Amino acid sequence: MINPNPKRSDEPVFWGLFGAGGMWSAIIAPVMILLVGILLPIGLFPGDALSYERVLAFAQSFIGRVFLFLMIVLPLWCGLHRMHHAMHDLKIHVPAGKWVFYGLAAILTVVTLIGVVTI
């Protein structure tokens, strides 16, 4: 007999954030590291393309704020999800582990949101 009131899982929400963070970390983050961390310091970037004024103007625009928010938050959720499942796989049982790892990710998301909004 099929249970008419099945227990709902919250895992798809966390897997969605994990997947989005993993894709962001694999596709967008390396490009940003290459541009800002390698090409810009050695002078292989054209002129004032990334001058302080232009970067500040981008960071203060709506698209820039969304980009900064996603650049911080998505890899954060991915990493904390991996840590949560790594602890489980290593048989290190953190009391209320779901609350610890996902709660920390949620708190840091709110802190990031406040920081990005107040730029």
Swiss-Prot record:
<comment type="function">
    <text>Two distinct, membrane-bound, FAD-containing enzymes are responsible for the catalysis of fumarate and succinate interconversion; fumarate reductase is used in anaerobic growth, and succinate dehydrogenase is used in aerobic growth. Anchors the catalytic components of the fumarate reductase complex to the cell inner membrane, binds quinones.</text>
</comment>
<dbReference type="GO" id="GO:0045283">
    <property type="term" value="C:fumarate reductase complex"/>
</dbReference>
<dbReference type="GO" id="GO:0005886">
    <property type="term" value="C:plasma membrane"/>
</dbReference>
<protein>
    <recommendedName>
        <fullName>Fumarate reductase subunit D</fullName>
    </recommendedName>
</protein>
<keyword id="KW-0472">Membrane</keyword>
<dbReference type="Pfam" id="PF02313">
    <property type="entry name" value="Fumarate_red_D"/>
</dbReference>
<keyword id="KW-1133">Transmembrane helix</keyword>
<keyword id="KW-0997">Cell inner membrane</keyword>
<keyword id="KW-0812">Transmembrane</keyword>
<dbReference type="InterPro" id="IPR003418">
    <property type="entry name" value="Fumarate_red_D"/>
</dbReference>
<feature type="transmembrane region" description="Helical">
    <location>
        <begin position="55"/>
        <end position="75"/>
    </location>
</feature>
<comment type="subunit">
    <text>Part of an enzyme complex containing four subunits: a flavoprotein (FrdA), an iron-sulfur protein (FrdB), and two hydrophobic anchor proteins (FrdC and FrdD).</text>
</comment>
<feature type="transmembrane region" description="Helical">
    <location>
        <begin position="26"/>
        <end position="46"/>
    </location>
</feature>
<comment type="similarity">
    <text>Belongs to the FrdD family.</text>
</comment>
<dbReference type="GO" id="GO:0006106">
    <property type="term" value="P:fumarate metabolic process"/>
</dbReference>
<dbReference type="InterPro" id="IPR034804">
    <property type="entry name" value="SQR/QFR_C/D"/>
</dbReference>
<dbReference type="GO" id="GO:0000104">
    <property type="term" value="F:succinate dehydrogenase activity"/>
</dbReference>
<feature type="transmembrane region" description="Helical">
    <location>
        <begin position="99"/>
        <end position="119"/>
    </location>
</feature>
<keyword id="KW-1003">Cell membrane</keyword>
